[in-house]
Amino acid sequence: MYFELKENKPHGTKDDPFSTYHIKNEGRSFQIPVHWHDELEIIYVKSGFLTVSISGENYIGTPGDAFVVSPGTLHFMGSQAGEVDYFTFLFPLEYISFCTDDMLDDKLLTPLKNGHLMIRPRIKDAAKELCEQLAEIYMAKNDEKKLEIAVQIK
């Protein structure tokens, strides 16, 4: 692990650990530096073209594409085209755990957290729909809807 590349920015709060970032870049190329963090991250491309690199694998995200970055995984994103609109959703794996020490924790969440299991970066169509809903909720900034989606995720 490259400790010097760890992103030290806190994401979320104790009461609301789910963080959403909306990045709308118009007209200039940019790159978010290579980094890693303890949270799971979902990257959703709303419009434009986004270069996403996850564990050294490069992808070109187009409108509707979504990617998963496992905790502790080196990644970066950027755009040479200049115009891109995308969202990142970050949350600790505990956010989707029922803390019951069940099969979900044993077979999925604990191995993900410990770096022993990697999720394929490209997300399938059903999960893309969830990303679109999350983006719409963020854009509406509706706290009641945020709670509703949190309940659906859990």
Predicted features along the sequence, with ranges:
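Generic protein-terminus/edge-of-domain signal
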Residues: M1-I60, D106, L117
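A hydrophobic/aromatic-rich effector-binding and dimerization subdomain
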Residues: Y2-F18, L74-Y138
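Short acidic-glycine-tyrosine-enriched beta hairpin
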Residues: G56-P71
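Basic, amphipathic alpha-helical hairpins
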Residues: A135-E148
